[in-house]
Swiss-Prot record:
GO terms for biological process: glucose metabolic process; glycolytic process. It holds the Pfam family Gp_dh_C. Belongs to the glyceraldehyde-3-phosphate dehydrogenase family. The keyword Cytoplasm applies. This is Glyceraldehyde-3-phosphate dehydrogenase 2. The keyword RNA-binding does not apply. The record marks 179 as: Activates thiol group during catalysis. GO terms for molecular function: glyceraldehyde-3-phosphate dehydrogenase (NAD+) (phosphorylating) activity; NAD binding; NADP binding. Pathway: Carbohydrate degradation; glycolysis; pyruvate from D-glyceraldehyde 3-phosphate: step 1/5. Keywords: Cytoplasm, Glycolysis, NAD, Oxidoreductase. The gene is gapdh-2. It comes from the Eukaryota.
Length: 335
């Protein structure tokens, strides 16, 4: 099998952290495209990060390329995905992290530039959606060239929902994510014609917002389709979010039973995806955590044996970026 070589389109928060995740996992990144960031600025942006700290390796530019730890990465500034020469750079897998080319039709433009497969780092309106640890076995290389890694919140919620549903059955559930603010929000009040609340100052407010993350769980766990929905509160922290899953169980279970089932999964089949803690943690304790979801055993509550509130943390930037890298490796292993 040929080596996994990756290209990244869009060098924003996720693009940069996917590069960090790939470097940590030994995945070769051969090209980056971003029409709005020149090479010199790219070096600076990758080297310094206010949330995750300075990159600990060596970063510089040489002969028109980005050099990270001695690895040369071609840099392009194409506006149109079809014009990016992925093939020339040897990047057969592309991470689409601009947030713009989300549909199969739009993301397929990368194939014209020589890419073989595309992973969209966001929910897609029509591409098959995969959550590592939950439904990656449904990936079919013969028919799927464009896939979605879902959202950071779906990646937190789905593994927990799977464990609970497999062990006790979920009759119905509501999710709330208390979510860190992101780059789409405003530093001070500004225009947001489609969703008025989203235009309010991110660090000044708790902002109710919509999210498709809970409904998307129904796409990766079909038995839960129509049984789950949810909403978000955007809060004034820069990173790390937390899911509150309140569910009615089919089969009664004590909170101790639930903890034991989650712990078993976290130390077994979902190791590295689902974490488990009994410590008295707060959000900043999870900055840089690479799990999709870390179950907080001490924060959940049970009203009775059929009605429970479960709490799970996630680094919405870094945990998610590691799953993008894991999905790339999984897909490559199926070639």
């Amino acid at each position: 099998m040929s080596e996994l070589c990756v290209g990244i389109n869009g060098f924003g928060r996720i693009g940069r952290l996917v590069l960090r995740a790939c470097l940590q996992k030994g995945i070769k990144v051969t090209a980056i495209n971003d029409p709005f960031i020149d090479l010199q600025y790219m070096v600076y942006m990758f080297k310094y990060d206010s949330t995750h700290g300075r990159y600990k390796g060596e970063v510089h530019m040489e002969d028109g390329k980005l050099i990270v730890d001695g690895q040369a990465i071609s840099v392009f500034q194409c506006m149109k995905p079809a014009e990016i020469p992925w093939g020339d750079a040897g990047a057969l897998y592309v991470v689409e992290s601009t947030g713009v080319f989300l549909s199969i039709e739009k993301a397929s433009a990368h194939i014209q530039g020589g890419a073989k497969r595309v992973v969209v780092s966001a929910p897609s309106p029509d591409a098959p959606m995969f959550v590592m640890g939950v439904n990656q076995d449904k990936y079919d290389p013969s028919s799927m060239t464009i896939v979605s890694n879902a959202s950071c919140t779906t990646n937190c919620l789905a593994p927990l929902a799977k464990v609970i549903h497999d062990n006790f059955g979920i009759e119905e559930a509501l999710m709330t994510t208390v979510h860190a603010y992101t780059a789409t929000q405003k530093t001070v009040d500004g225009p947001s014609a489609k969703a008025w609340r989203d235009g309010r100052g991110a660090h000044q407010n708790i902002i109710p917002a919509s999210t498709g993350a809970a409904k998307a769980v129904g796409k990766v766990i079909p038995e839960l389709n129509g049984k789950l929905t949810g909403m978000a509160f955007r809060v004034p922290v820069a990173d790390v979010s937390v899911v509150d899953l309140t569910c009615r169980l089919t089969r009664p279970a004590s909170y101790a039973n639930i903890k034991e089932s989650v712990k078993k999964a976290a130390h077994g089949p979902m190791k590295g995806i689902l974490g488990y803690t009994e410590d008295s943690v707060v959000s900043s304790d999870f900055v840089g955590d690479t799990h999709s979801s870390i179950f907080d055993a001490g924060a959940g509550i049970s009203l009775n044996d059929n009605f429970v509130k479960l709490i799970s943390w996630y680094d919405n930037e870094f945990g998610y970026s590691h799953r993008v890298a894991d999905l790339l490796m999984y897909m490559h292993s199926k070639e």
